[in-house]
């Protein structure tokens, strides 16, 4: 039976489709048909729909209910009247994971590789009144013995290998729950004589912050030369203000099979700037590029952007946005390993929690997300460190390096209009920088993926409007207290200006945990990682070795105590680390990113928010430690001894662009019910500063924990920031 998508019912009454007064676009979302495509002899572009099943588009096939590895054929039909002679028909895919082989009416149209890119296909010559569209989508299972995980061949980052996805990073099940599919919108676009495939926007600050120029590049296709006028308009999107517009007469050259580019510049004197959260309003402009001839509109493309200047100052002096220094209080973020499940509303929910935690930035860790993420961050003023989707090891060939560099350029071109993206980050923990891999992989060598890293970094560096971080090095991952060392190490001087990972695991609340671990595996007989009941826990990302051996945690006698112990440890660690590195602001620390913000599936990992979006104790600890104005407490040592004197240093750290005069710092130190120390001191707090205010000599009496409280009061006596710390005391 024919299944027809009605693109525009009003048009079906016409014998031909007249050239539209404006470009038109129709979504092809809905119930498509799908069939296993792993048999290479099966030609899914033809034949009947017998034995095909319904599958929703857009969706990752796993989230749509089909747990599948490898290839699927997708098919749908749609109808429309025969277009007019000068009409260009474009099929646009916003994201197909991972390989796409596209057929229309029995003819192969194009192949594409890459899960996150929008790609356009000219189908003008093959479009008819009744059309059958077929797509073979292949998200390959990579052989664990020869390819995965050290020599991966897909640029998918955390989507096909990571500690936080089903099965974990290194187990044979680490590729479970494949993310493949037509996961982002598909549409048919009709234009006249020319098609605009992309509008690339970048700010030019050569005339100063008060006289920005918007540089615009159109990526277009035209079968013949076109005499046209390009009108570029930048109108306020989320505020009321000046609208900027300019017309550019031009002759667009015929492109053939390769899209071409044309560049123009729009002066925007006194334009409103995009500011990050805590520093101002994130002004956004809706930019429209319209091509016209004497008969009307040929094509139009819109994109939203904001004007902001980002600079990484030398010598660890910090990052500036629009000339103002900004200290980065960040967190690593993955919304879901199945990107189609993350809607604008869900990103807004997550980012509200991020902001309430007092973070001003996220690191989109090891993947490119769906476009709603960047739209939400743009609107909220939430800064983004955007990684390329390269996690650990890959094919070391020149061909793969070229492929990864190409995809990195496409990321920059397609997502670079978002002002929230302030950093392009390269490969995460590349093998040449990960000597620990030598013990795990016999074929590891000290230069593995060094060329890949450099080619990707060079591709990212072509964007001169952002900070580029060539790769996320293991030296920037401060895992003391979890993978090595102790909490005490977190109080030591930092060795890098940028800290892109720190944290610890914690169990979620009991009601959430019950949805993750089967009842039969609820309580393993021992804490030894070889106990078979830990297998289910490890599949859901829990790390018994790090929990019980490295961190030295106890389960206690109940699940309630187990949850409490892990959450308390995570809370202590993230707060201790965050405060320590904030006290080291610009000496040398300029940016820090806790790992991770949220658990992405029914998992037990490093998230301070569980997969049901219920905060753990670590969330509230980080919320205190990330206060823009922070009365920080430095215990000097994490464990004290009874009856031995120690020192507590009280600091004020102010990330805000404004200071506070006439303030007071007040404190008290208690042990049990006894007050050991109390006082206050007048302070003037400079903007963008961090200073040690007072050192307190304290001698604990017995082994009860010390409770330290510190708060900042304004000139009216109102508490504007407060903090607390528990210090464990050991017997002498």
Regions found by a protein language model. Name each.
Residues 24-27, 32-42, 167, 174-181, ...:
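Substrate-binding clefts and catalytic carboxylate motifs of secreted carbohydrate-active enzymes
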Residues 13-15:
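N-terminal signal peptide c-region/cleavage motif recognized by signal peptidases
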Residues 119-123, 132, 142-146, 152-160, ...:
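Active-site mouth of glycoside hydrolases
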Residues 366, 386-388, 425-428, 470-472, ...:
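Active-site proximal loops enriched in glycine and acidic residues that flank catalytic Cys/His/Asp
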Residues 290-292, 376-382, 414, 455-463, ...:
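Alpha-helical structural signal in soluble globular domains
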Residues 1-2, 6, 17-364, 573, ...:
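Secreted/periplasmic carbohydrate-active enzymes, especially glycoside hydrolases
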């Amino acid at each position: 039976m024919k299944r027809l998508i009605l693109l525009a019912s009003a048009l079906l009454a016409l014998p031909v489709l007249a050239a539209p007064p404006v470009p038109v676009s129709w979504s092809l979302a809905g119930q498509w048909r799908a069939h296993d495509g792993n048999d290479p002899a099966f030609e899914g572009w033809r034949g009947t729909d017998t034995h095909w099943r319904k599958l929703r588009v857009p969706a990752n096939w796993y989230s749509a209910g089909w747990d599948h590895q490898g290839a699927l054929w997708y098919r749908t039909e749609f109808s429309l009247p025969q277009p007019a002679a000068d009409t260009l028909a474009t099929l646009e895919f916003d994201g197909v994971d991972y390989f796409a082989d596209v057929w229309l009416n029995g003819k192969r149209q194009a192949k594409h590789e890459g899960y996150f890119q929008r790609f356009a296909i000219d189908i003008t010559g093959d479009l008819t009144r009744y059309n059958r569209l077929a797509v073979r989508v292949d998200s390959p299972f990579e052989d664990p013995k020869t390819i995965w995980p050290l020599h991966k061949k897909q640029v998918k980052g955390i989507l096909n290998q990571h500690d936080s996805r089903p099965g974990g990073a290194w187990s044979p099940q680490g590729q479970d729950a494949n993310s493949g599919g037509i996961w982002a919108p598909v549409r048919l676009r009709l234009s006249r004589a020319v098609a605009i495939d992309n509008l690339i926007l970048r700010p030019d600050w050569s005339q100063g912050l008060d006289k920005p120029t918007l540089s615009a590049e159109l990526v277009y296709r035209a079968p013949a030369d076109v005499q046209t006028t390009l009108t570029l308009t930048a109108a306020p999107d989320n505020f009321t203000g000046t609208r900027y517009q300019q017309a550019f007469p031009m002759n667009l050259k015929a492109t053939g099979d390769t899209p071409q580019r044309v560049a123009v510049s729009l002066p925007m004197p006194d334009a409103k700037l995009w500011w990050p959260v805590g520093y101002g309003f994130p002004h956004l402009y809706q930019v429209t590029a319209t091509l016209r001839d004497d008969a009307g509109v040929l094509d139009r493309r819109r994109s939203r952007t904001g004007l902001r200047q980002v600079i990484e100052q030398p010598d660890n002096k910090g990052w500036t946005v629009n000339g103002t220094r900004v200290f980065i209080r960040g967190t690593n973020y993955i919304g879901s390993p199945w990107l189609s499940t993350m809607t604008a509303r869900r990103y807004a929910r997550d980012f509200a929690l991020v902001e309430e935690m007092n973070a001003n930035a996220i690191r989109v860790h090891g993947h490119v997300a769906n476009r709603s993420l960047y739209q939400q961050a743009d609107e909220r003023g939430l800064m983004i460190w955007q990684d390329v989707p390269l996690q650990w090891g890959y094919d070391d060939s020149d061909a793969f390096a070229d492929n990864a560099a190409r995809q990195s350029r496409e990321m920059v071109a397609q997502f670079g209009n978002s002002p929230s993206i302030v950093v392009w980050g390269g490969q995460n923990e590349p093998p040449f920088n990960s000597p620990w891999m030598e013990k795990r992989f016999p074929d590891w060598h000290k230069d593995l993926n060094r060329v890949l890293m450099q080619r990707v970094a060079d591709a990212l560096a072509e964007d001169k409007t952002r900070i580029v971080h060539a790769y996320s090095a293991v030296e920037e991952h401060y895992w003391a207290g979890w993978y090595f060392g102790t909490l005490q190490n977190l109080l030591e001087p930092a060795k890098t200006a940028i800290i892109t990972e720190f944290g610890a695991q914690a169990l979620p609340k009991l009601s959430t945990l019950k949805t993750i671990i089967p009842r039969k595996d609820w309580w393993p007989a021992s804490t030894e990682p070889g106990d078979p009941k830990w297998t289910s826990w490890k599949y859901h990302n829990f790390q018994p070795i790090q929990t019980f051996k490295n961190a030295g945690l106890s389960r206690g006698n109940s699940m309630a105590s187990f949850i409490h112990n892990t959450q308390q440890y995570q809370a202590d660690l993230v707060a201790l680390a965050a405060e320590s590195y904030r006290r080291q602001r610009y000496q040398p620390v300029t940016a820090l990113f806790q790992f991770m913000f949220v658990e992405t599936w029914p998992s037990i990992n490093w998230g301070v928010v569980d997969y049901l979006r219920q905060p753990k104790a670590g969330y509230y600890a980080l919320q205190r430690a990330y206060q823009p104005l922070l009365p920080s407490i430095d215990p000097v040592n994490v464990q004290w001894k009874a009856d031995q004197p120690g020192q507590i240093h009280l600091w004020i750290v102010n990330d805000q662009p404004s200071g506070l005069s006439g303030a007071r710092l007040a404190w008290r130190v208690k042990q049990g019910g006894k007050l050991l120390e109390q006082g206050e001191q007048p302070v003037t707090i400079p903007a963008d500063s961090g200073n040690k205010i007072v050192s307190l000599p304290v001698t604990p009496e017995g082994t009860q924990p010390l409770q330290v409280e510190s708060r900042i009061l304004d000139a009216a006596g109102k508490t504007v920031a407060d903090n607390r710390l528990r210090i464990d005391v050991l017997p002498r």
